[in-house]
Amino acid sequence: MSLEQQYTAILAQLGEDVSREGLVDTPKRAAKAMQYLCRGYQQTLEEVVNGALFSSDNSEMVMVKNIELYSLCEHHMLPFIGKAHVAYLPNGKVLGLSKVARIVDMFARRLQIQENLTRQIAEAVEQVTGASGVGVVIEAQHMCMMMRGVEKQNSTLVTSVMLGHFRSNTATRSEFLSLIK
């Protein structure tokens, strides 16, 4: 059964008239939207980075902050929306600037929990760059908590993963955290 057919079945199960004007193309649109929102499954880290790794003598912190992200909670398939802050300490190589955002998007465009998303991003940046440390903080609002359940409209989940010097060196961690404020 195709994704489109499954959306038709869901609408019918909800009691909707799937032949009414406003819903005629909804299953097709919903299937296309879901495929787009989950396109990270069709991407690999190698494809996303695409060789954009450059030699550099810089060993100071490199950070991209306020990277918008949109993902779907794996428990309810509802969106969570937020921003990621990603930093690393180069160890002879720097990553093309847009590639940090593309790594975030690749993992965010999968059914996820934010805790795992944060770790996947950190480990991918570490793997690709060979950095001596990586820090990732994600702040996001979860529709599964805002639209249903406890219905808390102003809640934000904050997660962090610190690897290498970001974990072992308090000054590095503090510098990173102060830069994202």
Swiss-Prot record:
Molecular function terms from GO: GTP binding; GTP cyclohydrolase I activity; zinc ion binding
Methyltransferase listed as a keyword: no
Gene Ontology CC: cytoplasm
Record flagged with keyword Glycosyltransferase: no
Record GO biological process: one-carbon metabolic process; tetrahydrobiopterin biosynthetic process; tetrahydrofolate biosynthetic process
EC number annotated for this UniProt entry: 3.5.4.16
Protein's name in the database: GTP cyclohydrolase 1
Biological source species: Azotobacter vinelandii (strain DJ / ATCC BAA-1303)
Lineage, broadest ranks: Bacteria, Pseudomonadati, Pseudomonadota, Gammaproteobacteria, Pseudomonadales
